[in-house]
Amino acid sequence: MTVQYPTIADCVGNTPLVRLQRLPGETSNTLLVKLEGNNPAGSVKDRPALSMITRAELRGDIRPGDTLIEATSGNTGIALAMAAAIKGYKMILIMPDNSTAERKAAMTAYGAELILVSKEEGMEGARDLADKLQREGRGKVLDQFANGDNPEAHYHSTGPEIWQQTGGSITHFVSSMGTTGTIMGVSRYLKEQNPAVQIVGLQPMEGSAIPGIRRWPQEYLPKIYDASRVDRVVDMHQDEAEDIMRRLAREEGIFCGVSSGGAVAAMLRLSRELENAVLVAIICDRGDRYLSSGVYDPR
């Protein structure tokens, strides 16, 4: 029987879980990566983007034809632009101007209006401008950083998928932290199944810049973040994240972004401390969004 989907939105989720073959080396551990770049708009953010819009509709907060606003470093914006196109919303996205050309082009390809702030203003400036536009009546901010529908998407989809795909054998979960929606939702689900599962978050070390994740100043810390749901936070240098990202492509055939390289680098570090463990890391997007930045240039 031919499988048909009503819309592209119905293709979000149920992404593959793949075992790493070469990077782990000799080990008794099983190292797995979840390929979120296989989602229609190319990242893990497809899940919360649809969740935030759909649940807001169900509450009566928005309806097709409205204008939605969001500050983004890239992936959420692309996912929201796709979701808005499917559901009939106007989308205003605000992002730092040092984001890659591929991300900007993807957003406008879906029909979103793109507003750039300076790299000095960064994501903090983008978030402030989004709030300002909402106060001025330009539209409604979805606010992925404070919106409970963000982690709920992962509680109801990503977490259960990982549990099912590992047959409940997962011992460690590793995820980069930006809005923290992925790690919050997955942690809640996995800990309900087995409180012994260890949740490991990744953030850039001081002075490092890894696209899509941040060391947030206290006043901008995502409101959805609950530190008690994370057992360990790993600080990662961008050089290590980029090195593992390139090795994933060349040794495993997995073409991903820098924060995904960081998550796998953290998983590899962790694996060296363990025996007979089952580790899962999130590959949150695809590498084609980073080509213009030069991170994949021959070295």
Swiss-Prot record:
Molecular function terms, GO-annotated: cysteine synthase activity
Pathway(s): Amino-acid biosynthesis; L-cysteine biosynthesis; L-cysteine from L-serine: step 2/2
Keywords associated with the record: Amino-acid biosynthesis, Cysteine biosynthesis, Pyridoxal phosphate, Transferase
Positions of post-translational N6-(pyridoxal phosphate)lysine modification: K45
Cofactors required: pyridoxal 5'-phosphate
PROSITE patterns membership: CYS_SYNTHASE
Binding locations of pyridoxal 5'-phosphate: N75, G178, T179, T180, G181, T182, S259
Documented EC number(s): 2.5.1.47
Primary enzyme class: transferase
Catalytic activity: O-acetyl-L-serine + hydrogen sulfide = L-cysteine + acetate
An individual GO BP term: cysteine biosynthetic process from serine
GO CC annotation: cytoplasm
Xref: InterPro entries: Cys_synth, Cys_Synth/Cystath_Beta-Synth, CysM, P-phosphate_BS, TrpB-like_PALP, TrpB-like_PALP_sf
Family assignment from sequence similarity: Belongs to the cysteine synthase/cystathionine beta-synthase family.
Protein name: Cysteine synthase B
